[in-house]
């Protein structure tokens, strides 16, 4: 039986880079749980429930489950019987931070391993922060996010 992975993030919003990481990781795992985390920003662009629902609507593979992340990531992983944490790396600059997180998670729960997948070249510059900035300034985000997410962001902007 293939293992279960947790793919954590704020996904505010879900980008094509996130989707690419999940699609490339699916052959490695029996199941991937996308753990949508609350954001530390006082005013998230999308509410947690909105993000969870959008992600679930975009990622329709039965091996993908989308849940709100509660508590410590390693505790969440144990609760859902996951033995891997999946992380995407866009650039070398991501590695230092992710490496520290991986070691901290290992200290908290050595039975849970962190797996890194590098972003494909076409996605290495895409970030939720940049997408939010483009939305705020009235730009077109359709090259960077799934069509469903682009439509949702456009509707929110028109309100």
Swiss-Prot record:
**Which residues carry the site feature described as Transition state stabilizer?**
18
- Kindly indicate whether the keyword Transcription belongs to this entry: no
Q: What class of enzyme is it?
A: transferase
- GO BP term (any one): coenzyme A biosynthetic process
Q: Which SUPFAM superfamilies match?
A: Nucleotidylyl transferase (SSF52374)
Give the top-rank taxon of the lineage listed in the UniProt record for this protein: Bacteria
GO MF annotations, alphabetized: ATP binding; pantetheine-phosphate adenylyltransferase activity
Against Pfam families, the record matches this protein to: CTP_transf_like (PF01467)
Q: What does this protein do?
A: Reversibly transfers an adenylyl group from ATP to 4'-phosphopantetheine, yielding dephospho-CoA (dPCoA) and pyrophosphate.
The protein in question is named: Phosphopantetheine adenylyltransferase
Annotated organism of origin? Coxiella burnetii (strain RSA 493 / Nine Mile phase I)
Q: Which gene encodes it?
A: coaD
